[in-house]
Regions:
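Terminal regions of secretory-pathway proteins
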Residues: 1-118, 122-123, 141-478
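Active-site nucleophile-adjacent alpha helix/oxyanion-hole segment immediately C-terminal to the catalytic cysteine
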Residues: 133-141
């Protein structure tokens, strides 16, 4: 597959860095998933050697949307409306084809009132969070219509089960096959008529987050970030971060109320099917390069060290003593890349934009850091690389290679297998949308329900029967 021609007039036109297989929205859905799985807010200088056993994850090691729900209506009451079942919603935004587009709910100081403040880092992940808020609230309204005698606690529990099941289905059958090698996924999980079985070899139990996933493999998304995005027809192309602080509208940085015309048109970020539609912006290739704007990101308040994201990722791997990519590949029994196949830089075919790891840093010959190895492995899977140069046309989709695919697939599938309430273990827990675009279209097109709402939690009816969840079976992606 020949790379698209570079248009020098705009970073947002089709160019050689784009991945024609993955729409741009999946970059930020991946970030949304990451924030659901991992959180460590302790101070970190990135240099003090740290034992993996000393790591603390403040998120549950489950795909359970605790970043959306917090500790629930009792433990995180500030996230919820007065009835204790609907989540707070933000101000309406214009500019989108979705007339119900909304900002995140915010305090009078502009702080987002959500389960994980990191989902306000940029306008795109904030928009995804807002869509899941609306999806939850619409699901609550549906449960109320179908089971009007339920107590508020029962309504919330039923709605959360439906939302989480839909989310898990999208992670497993929409997101994962776009980023990982389907052959690896099939070796880890089989789906026969809706009955899912697993074959986990790396992580037989994912009750704790694998460090290789959190610190290396799942950071591939940094390479997918585009230089510029158009969120709707009214707003010009903008970078994720411009280097300016406190000036809403010049970039897509969050942590403040969104400009009123920043409603996101999701048809620019997700396609309805496996085929990428003409107007959908594409992610950048999963390769060993990141866009310049990510080197300008502000430091987390808990961290010291360099602002450059690539350097931070490498320091974090070294701090935790992660094995090299070559060592992990050997342990998995997959082919180990030669040093001349490990390109650091853009996978465009331009030899001036990439260099072998051994030429860049001779001390890394034969022992490439796992994060960099996984990114370079993606390039070496999509293209034939010989003596530090891409040879011939693209031969495979730009997804994770054998090592990256195995770590990410086993983590996601292992998390679900370890959760007795997941869709892997509860067969009727299935969503109605097969892709994120389908879900967001459903949310956008849903008419608001005019209802009296629920009574306050302490006066809700008790003893009502639990609802039966009856969503239609999904069409599995193969």
């Amino acid at each position: 597959m020949a790379a698209p021609e570079v248009n020098p007039t705009s970073e947002n036109e089709r160019d050689a860095e784009e991945n024609v297989d993955i729409p741009a929205g999946y970059t930020y859905f991946g970030q949304f998933v990451d924030h659901d799985l991992t959180l460590d807010d302790r101070p970190n200088d990135l240099t003090t050697p740290t034992a993996v056993s000393a790591l603390v994850n403040l998120r549950t090691p489950q795909l359970d949307l605790d970043s959306l729900y917090g500790l629930g209506p009792v433990g995180s009451s500030a996230l919820y409306q007065a009835d204790g079942v609907h989540l707070l919603e933000g101000a309406l935004l214009t500019g989108s084809t979705d007339v119900g587009a909304k900002d995140l709910p915010r305090s009078t100081t502009g702080r987002a009132i959500i389960g994980d403040p990191r989902n306000d880092e940029n306008r795109i992940v904030a928009g995804i969070h807002s869509m899941f808020i609306r999806f939850h609230n619409q699901t609550v309204d549906r449960v109320l219509r179908e089971q009007p005698t339920l107590s508020s606690e029962q309504v919330f529990t039923a709605a959360r089960k439906i939302v989480v099941a839909q989310y898990q289905q999208l992670v497993l059958f929409d997101y994962l096959p776009r980023i990982a090698d389907q052959r690896v996924i099939d070796s880890v999980m089989s789906d026969r008529g809706g009955r899912i079985t697993t074959n986990l070899s790396l992580y037989s139990s994912c009750m704790q987050m694998p460090v290789e996933f959190a610190v290396a493999a799942y950071r591939f998304g940094h390479s997918q970030v585009r230089g510029l995005y158009r969120i709707n027809a009214q707003v010009d192309r903008l970078p994720v971060f411009s280097g300016s602080f406190g000036t809403p509208g010049v970039d897509l940085v969050g942590f403040s109320p969104a400009p009123s015309n920043f409603g996101i048109d999701w048809s620019r970020f997700f396609s309805r099917s496996n085929a990428v539609e003409p107007d959908v912006q594409l992610s950048y290739k999963i390769d060993a390069s990141i866009t310049n704007s990510l080197s300008l990101l502000p430091l987390p308040v808990t961290s010291a060290g360099p602002a450059d994201l690539a350097k931070r990722n490498l320091l974090r791997s070294s701090q935790l003593g992660l094995p090299s990519g070559q060592d992990v590949a050997r342990a998995m029994g997959v082919r180990v890349l030669r040093d001349d196949e490990i390109l650091i830089g853009k996978a465009t075919g331009d030899t001036s934009e990439a260099v072998t790891v051994s030429a860049l840093a001779p001390t890394l010959a034969g022992k490439t850091p796992l994060w960099a190895y996984i990114l370079a492995e993606s390039t070496a899977t999509a293209y034939r690389v010989v003596n530090g140069a891409i040879v011939g046309a693209q031969r495979a989709p730009f997804r994770l290679g054998p090592v990256g695919s195995r770590i990410v697939a086993e983590t996601f599938i292992g998390l679900l297998a370890s959760d007795p309430n997941s869709l892997i273990n509860v067969s009727q827990m299935q969503g109605q949308a097969n892709t994120l675009r389908q879900l967001f279209d459903q949310v956008s097109q849903s008419r608001p329900v005019v209802s009296q709402g629920m009574p306050p939690r302490d006066s809700a009816r008790q003893g009502a029967r639990q609802p039966q969840l009856r969503p239609q079976a999904p069409r599995r992606r193969r």
